[in-house]
Amino acid sequence: MGVHLITGAGSGIGAALAALFASRGQELWLLARDEARAGELRARFPRSRTLVADLSVPGAIRARLEAQALPGRLDSLLHVAGVAESGRVGELSAEVWQDTLAVNLIAPAELTGLLLPALRESRGHVVFVNSGAGVHAPPRLSAYAASKFGLKALAESLRAEEFAHGVRVTTVYPGETDTPMQVRLHGQFGLPYVPEAHMSPTSVAAAVVTALDLPRDATMSDLMLRPGC
């Protein structure tokens, strides 16, 4: 039975991944911001186990999680949680920059470092759900894009460092996906939201699982996804 830890499982791509793994009878570990959200996740995915840590507080994740029972082995660690605020560079506050970098970049680095022994034990797989903004930085999303460019660099360094330990690393770059974040960003940009013009989170989850299911002699290092026609 595979063992998988997911951040951001409350909605969107993270929830779709959790549902897909649950349908396969896999062991799920879901990270929640607080106890209330952890209870919601356990109710939605009854066989899951939850961990509680606030990804927006750098440096506190390790201390919080080391006080909880952690998996002894991990087949995959999936970084899906993310935040985004729109605004021009001259408009974004230092707090927005700090929060965005904390959740989207620093937390994945800290969490991965903490769980490397469990990943090495099972020759596991780390998946970073990035964004098209991690390839081409659009206007009015500078903090988000900067965090995603940094996440790309983190993945590349980790891949080189952990190759000898058999840990595989994949970065997924989804195009526009039908998630609450996209709905909110369209509202901030004053754009109409058309769900049919977006990929479903389930489609992105299926692509991620394809990367996880590859034989050991192959690694999908980067996965670009765009809405179909």
What are these regions (language model features)?
Residues 24-40:
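Conserved glycine-rich Rossmann-like NAD(P)H-binding loop of the short-chain dehydrogenase/reductase
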Residues 10-11:
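Conserved glycine-rich cofactor-binding loop
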Residues 131:
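Residue(s) in the substrate-gating loop at a strand-loop-helix junction
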Residues 112, 147:
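Active-site helix of classical SDR
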Residues 88-89, 96-98:
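Substrate-binding pocket helix/loop in short-chain dehydrogenase/reductase
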Residues 136, 157-167:
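Active-site-adjacent segment of SDR/Rossmann-fold oxidoreductases
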Residues 167, 171, 192-229:
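C-terminal helical subdomain
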